[in-house]
UniProtKB/Swiss-Prot annotation:
InterPro entries xref list: PPIase_dom_sf, PPIase_FKBP_dom, Trig_fac, Trigger_fac_C, Trigger_fac_C_sf, Trigger_fac_ribosome-bd_bac, Trigger_fac_ribosome-bd_sf, Trigger_fact/SurA_dom_sf
Name of the protein: Trigger factor
EC id: 5.2.1.8
Free-text comment on this protein's domains from its UniProt entry: Consists of 3 domains; the N-terminus binds the ribosome, the middle domain has PPIase activity, while the C-terminus has intrinsic chaperone activity on its own.
Pfam families xrefs: FKBP_C (PF00254), Trigger_C (PF05698), Trigger_N (PF05697)
PROSITE patterns: FKBP_PPIASE
């Protein structure tokens, strides 16, 4: 195999590779011989088809298989000999394909991973925020539980519905005068002044009496989950059937038993544990973000542009989707596209650099992702698709890249845990509200 370097600029590398025909001919002949053993042609006994006929009929398909195999093998050997760690899948351009008596020639372009010097992190100082679960938080959650178990009693008085009342209605939603899917329902209890499933829906029923009919106009939010209705103005034909009042049950052991618990104390314990879990997740997001901010200041190496481009394209696809349905936050919505792209390219570069630095720290510290951890991640992914778990596992078994997509976040979190353990961490108690205001890490 002959290798000629054609580019060596920054992280970019390019080579021209020539594989002599003599190296390929033996493999090609062996492959055709294997084919000859299995094919059946009229007039010939199995395994006795002339080599010239086998070559005539199957030569092109064998050449195509051998071409891919030879290019992959030669590229792998090239990277090993040149000690290249490619940042992304290399670009291959075949100059001269496999033909009788001709060498295989192809070009390889790739970016290499940068040489990363892990900075000294021994003096790293971090603050770990935490919050305690208050009785007020537990009581509020219990009130929510009671509201979900409330009953509705009919109001016999003939009067208009007022705020706080519940109106039992039938409705038919129409888009451009035609009923739309999912827009029709009967015997729905609507709390007047409460949160309707569309802004303005419940409010316009105030003042209706049992037996009254009304047409109301509402506009679906731009980010409504049904794309065919997002941002659309529709009407609802409302028929009020009865006026009711909501009666919340007493918050006691009886309520606990009706929803499957032993007593009220058990519910309080579960609510407390769930809140503690949420606070711990928020606390980790904050300390992780602070850690990444500190690491980001020490990433003085060049990021492969191909990796930055790939990361940016993923981010920008989400941004465009959010913009399409009106989910962009106020700050981003006020920026022009050029500024917005520059901001998110900076984020993409930060993510790539931090990812490479964390991976290098993990490599040097020999931090590994175990088979059990990968299996756990696959099981967690499979639980998202009830009834299709086997299909999910088959997908992972056939797609190594998808498995690597699970491995990356696990390794990242293990490296983050290692670095937090290494740092000088100060614990600080804050309120749950202060903890909830903390934005997540960018990586």
């Amino acid at each position: 195999m002959q290798v000629t370097p054609t580019l060596n600029e920054g992280l970019k590398r390019a080579f021209t590779v020539v594989v002599p025909s003599a190296d390929l001919q033996a493999r090609r002949d062996a492959r055709l011989a294997e084919v000859a053993k299995t094919i059946k042609l009229p007039g010939f006994r199995p395994g006795k088809v002339p080599a010239s006929l086998v070559k005539q009929r199957y030569g092109e398909s064998v050449n195509a298989e051998l071409l891919e195999e030879a290019v992959n093998d030669a590229t792998a050997k090239l990277f090993e000999e040149q000690k290249i760690r490619p940042a992304m899948q290399p670009k291959i351009e075949v100059v001269s394909a496999i033909e009788d008596g001709k060498d295989l020639e192809f070009k390889v372009e790739t970016e290499v991973l940068p040489e990363i010097e892990v900075p000294d992190l021994s003096g790293l100082k971090l603050t770990r925020l935490g919050a305690k679960v208050s009785e007020e938080t537990v009581d509020k959650a219990l009130n929510d539980v009671a509201r979900r178990s409330r009953k509705f009693e009919t109001i016999e008085e003939d009067r208009p519905a007022a705020k706080g009342d519940v109106l039992c209605v039938d409705f038919v939603g129409k888009l451009d005068g035609t009923p739309f899917d999912g827009g029709t329902a009967d015997d729905v209890n609507v709390e007047i002044g409460g949160e309707g499933f569309i802004p303005g829906f419940a409010e316009q029923m105030e003042g209706m009496k049992a037996g009254e009919e009304r047409v109301i106009n509402v506009t679906f939010p731009a980010d409504y989950q049904a794309e065919e209705l997002a941002g659309k103005a529709v009407t609802f034909d409302i028929k009020a059937k009865s006026l009711k009042k909501a009666v919340d049950p007493a918050i006691d052991d009886e309520l606990a038993k009706t929803i499957g618990f032993e007593n009220l104390e058990q519910i309080r314990k579960i609510i407390t544990e769930q809140a503690e879990g949420e606070y711990q997740q928020l606390s980790r997001l904050r300390i992780k973000r602070d850690l990444l901010d500190a690491l980001s200041e020490k990433t003085d190496f060049e990021a492969p542009s191909s990796m930055v481009d790939a990361e940016f394209n993923q981010i920008w696809a989400r941004v465009e989707e959010d913009r399409k349905v009106g989910r962009l936050d106020e700050e981003d919505a006020g920026k022009d596209e050029e500024t917005l792209k520059a901001d998110y390219r900076r984020i993409a570069e930060r993510r790539v650099k931090l990812g490479l630095l964390l991976a290098e720290i993990g490599r040097k510290q020999e931090i590994q992702v175990s088979r059990e951890e990968l299996l756990g991640a696959m099981q967690q992914e499979a639980r998202r698709y009830p009834g299709q778990e086997q299909m999910v596992f088959e997908f992972f078994s056939k797609n190594p890249q998808a498995v690597e997509g699970l491995r990356g976040p696990i390794l990242e979190n293990k490296v983050v845990d290692y670095l937090i353990e290494l740092a000088d961490v100060t614990d600080k108690e804050v309120t749950p509200e202060e903890l909830a205001e903390i934005p997540p890490a960018e990586l």
